[in-house]
Amino acid sequence: MKLIIGIGGVTNGGKTTLTNSLLKALPNCCVIHQDDFFKPQDQIAVGEDGFKQWDVLESLDMETMLSTVQAWVKDPHKFARAHGVSLQSGASDTHVLLLEGFLLYSYRPLVDLYSQRYFLTVPYEECKRRRRSRTYMVPDPPGLFDGHVWPMYQKYRREMEQDGVEVVYLDGMKSPEGLFHQVLEDIQNRLLNTS
């Protein structure tokens, strides 16, 4: 059995923390981080708002990300070995792929591949506070959060909802442990009910 689980949502919402916890707990589990598919900095457009457009779908090489997912679907054993994942012998017929990122549900060719889609949310003020506390390879220029990051999050979330993409909303204000146990239990139930 193969499951593809999406862990999407707002920037600094807890996606990576949740994904890393699930990765350790699930059998034969691999992860693909959307952030690994950013185009080179010199290919990122500057928008009318004056900011580099990092928070738009066009800043990502989604075709390559889709190809990577398709490689896992075709042969999860080979994919796991190539990515240094040790397969558990007792669960050899169970494979889980976690996709983690902020625009997972905006690229139509990926949307229907998910077995389950989660979407982390946090309120504006908390998101802004968390964003300020992080250090990025390309530092945020003044005004980026209010002028670009938050408006793009709102735009893509609205489009996702208008397109009818079904997600399980998760409250990113809950403790990381609480979110982990909620999602792990959900995935384990899905594995039990489909085996």
Curated annotation (Swiss-Prot):
GO biological process, one term: NADP biosynthetic process
Residues that, per the record, bind substrate: 35-38, 54-55, 131, 136-137
Organism superkingdom: Eukaryota
Binding positions (Mg(2+)): 16, 35
Record GO terms (molecular function): ATP binding; metal ion binding; nicotinate riboside kinase activity; ribosylnicotinamide kinase activity; ribosylnicotinate kinase activity
Keywords: ATP-binding, Kinase, Magnesium, Metal-binding, Nucleotide-binding, Pyridine nucleotide biosynthesis, Transferase
EC category name: transferase
EC number: 2.7.1.22, 2.7.1.173
Catalytic activity field: beta-nicotinamide D-riboside + ATP = beta-nicotinamide D-ribonucleotide + ADP + H(+); beta-D-ribosylnicotinate + ATP = nicotinate beta-D-ribonucleotide + ADP + H(+)
Homology family: Belongs to the uridine kinase family. NRK subfamily.
Oligomeric and partner information: Monomer. Interacts with ITGB1 alone or when associated with alpha-7, but not with alpha-5.
Protein name: Nicotinamide riboside kinase 2
